[in-house]
A protein has these predicted regions:
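Extracellular glycan-modifying ectodomains
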Residues: 1-141
Length: 141
């Protein structure tokens, strides 16, 4: 498949988007939304804020059910693959932050070129007419 995009970047919802891009040879680097569960409005807000507070510990909440899972309460993101349940957050946050800083900087640099964004549209949250809230947001913006 020939395309005119320099980059094809996952905007997430869940990990499978990046996995499928990789499976078909369309993913050339790791980006911030690849391996997490992400709220679409949170993704847009995070990009507009240039990833400020992405891993700010003030907004990180550890799951009671699975101690490896953390939620960013500002952007409504869930990190499932980055943390070790046997270490306290403060001992592992620097390493995770460095990884996401590289990915965020790569993202902001990459989107200056021709970029195709791919996102799985969640239908888990619907309005009273049974239409996906994410799809409505996209249509309205």
């Amino acid at each position: 498949m020939e395309n005119s995009y320099k980059n094809i970047i996952s905007l997430g919802y869940f990990c499978e988007v990046a996995g499928e891009l990789e499976k078909y040879g369309l993913r050339n680097a790791s980006f911030p939304f690849d391996w997490m569960i992400s709220d679409f409005e949170g993704v847009i807000s995070c990009i507009k804020n240039e990833f400020k507070d992405f891993l700010n510990p003030t907004y990180l909440s550890q799951s009671c059910n699975d101690r490896t899972h953390y939620k960013n309460t500002k952007y409504n993101f869930y990190f499932f693959h980055d943390f070790d349940k046997y270490q306290p957050l403060h001992k592992q946050l620097r390493k995770v932050t460095e990884k996401y800083k590289r990915r965020s900087e790569r993202f902001l640099k990459s989107i200056k070129s021709e970029t195709l964004f791919v996102r799985y549209i969640s239908d888990e949250i619907k309005n009273e007419n049974e239409k996906s809230i994410e799809l409505l947001w996209i249509e309205e913006n």
